[in-house]
Amino acid sequence: MEKLAIVVPCYNEEEVLKIASEALRGVLDDLIHKGKIAEDSFILFVNDGSKDRTWELIEEEHQAHPVQVCGVKLAGNVGHQFALTAGLITAMDLSDVTVSIDADLQDDVAVIEEMIDKFHNGCDIVYGVRKERKTDTFFKRTTAQGFYKVMEMMGVKTVYNHADFRLMSKRAVEQFSKYQETNLFLRGMMPLIGYQTDCVYYDRDRKSVV
């Protein structure tokens, strides 16, 4: 049975971290109970130089749940994309498949099971895609559309309405780790990896877990 690592980049997440940990541990427990992932699957919180109690709370969660929760403490604030990359590279040697998700859990954790199912059916990358942007303001919706159009004009392949909520197989992460980019934009790099891909669709919660 494949070992899953859920990678969660964190910056000043003290208000949501314990709630996120509980929710994600629930996902692990459910998938383990259904026989879809290994019993030693885990959550990897990546502390991106937080200035609040984020790291302290990660340590507390690890002490309370040593098998399911672990953490990586970066030396300073390197930004979301680099923190996520650090988590993926760390998880690469410790797991067979990864799922990345933000700590606020605005992305629907319920579709992680569908991602795992698609992985078992041969997919190396599964994108989490928002069904629509009804909860966004007019400004955010318009600028998002403009962003994707600019990316398309520049020849950058992206999946519309996908951020960084995705599943990656071990070999997909290994291939990604070979890229030597200084200005990381993971959404634009994923299609370059190749391998079989698919999408899962969900409604994004405009509220965080708090």
What are these model-predicted stretches?
Residues 1-3, 187-210:
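Hydrophobic helical membrane-anchoring modules
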Residues 44-55, 105-106:
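A conserved acidic beta->alpha catalytic loop
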Residues 13-16, 50, 108:
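Donor nucleotide-sugar binding loop of glycosyltransferases
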Residues 32-49, 73:
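Short beta-strand/loop segment that forms part of the nucleotide-sugar
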Residues 94-106:
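Short beta-strand-to-loop acidic/aromatic patch adjacent to the donor-nucleotide binding site
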Residues 41, 55-90, 94:
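Conserved donor nucleotide-binding strand/loop of the catalytic core
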Residues 1-30, 34-38:
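N-proximal low-complexity "stem/linker" segments adjacent to membrane-targeting elements
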Residues 74-76, 80-90, 97, 109-186, ...:
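Acceptor/aglycone-binding surface of glycosyltransferases and processive sugar-polymer synthases
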